[in-house]
Amino acid sequence: MYNVGKIVNTHGLIGEIRVIATTDFPEERFQVGNTVYLFEKNSKKPEKLIIRSHRKHKNFDLLMFEGFTGIHQVERMKEGVLKIKEAQLTDLEENEFYFHEIIGCIVVTTDGEELGEITEILTPGANDVWVVKGSDKKEKLIPYIADVVKEININDKKITIEVMEGLLD
C-alpha cells in the first residue's frame, strides 16, 4: 500500500479531518467515492473508508468519510495515515514518476560524484524539490527541472544531475 496522507487533526464539529497530503495527486486521490485505508497510530490493521467530501482549506485537504458524522467519531483518527492499494495507482505519462519511485534513489553528478539518497520530495510551487541526504548527513536541495536533472533510471534507483553554479553551496 502507498501513503497518500497523514491526518493531523479534526476540523469543526461535523466529522471533517485535516490531512497533509503525501500524494502527487490529492484532487484525484481524495475524490468523492474513492476508497482509502486508515492505519491508526500504532495499528497495523487498516480500516476501509469511503470519501464523502473533499475540499481544500489553507495548506490542508479536508475530508469526510461515509458513516462518520461528528467530531467524536473521527478524533481517534488523529495521527493516522491514509493509504491506497497499488491497483489504485494510475498510469503516468512518459517521464513522470510517483514519489515512491523517486524516494530512495541515489543522486550522482554528471562527473560521477555520489551526492546521496533522496529522502523526501517538497512541493513548494513551480517545481518539486528533492531532499538529498549525503553520507555527511547534510541535506542538499535539488530542484526537479530539466536544466539540473539529466537522467532518471528507476530500475537502478539512480538519478544523474548536472550541478549548476551555486546549486550545492
Swiss-Prot record:
GO terms for molecular function: ribosome binding. Transmembrane segments: none annotated. SUPFAM superfamilies: PRC-barrel domain (SSF50346), Translation proteins (SSF50447). GO terms for cellular component: cytoplasm; ribosome. Keywords: Chaperone, Cytoplasm, Ribosome biogenesis, rRNA processing. InterPro entries: PRC-brl_dom, PRC_barrel-like_sf, RimM, RimM_N, RimM_N_sf, Transl_B-barrel_sf. One of its GO terms (biological process) is rRNA processing. It is found in: Cytoplasm. Residues 94-167 form the PRC barrel domain. An accessory protein needed during the final step in the assembly of 30S ribosomal subunit, possibly for assembly of the head region. Essential for efficient processing of 16S rRNA. May be needed both before and after RbfA during the maturation of 16S rRNA. It has affinity for free ribosomal 30S subunits but not for 70S ribosomes. Binds ribosomal protein uS19. Belongs to the RimM family. The PRC barrel domain binds ribosomal protein uS19. This is Ribosome maturation factor RimM. It comes from Listeria monocytogenes serotype 4b (strain F2365). The lineage of its organism: Bacteria, Bacillati, Bacillota, Bacilli, Bacillales.
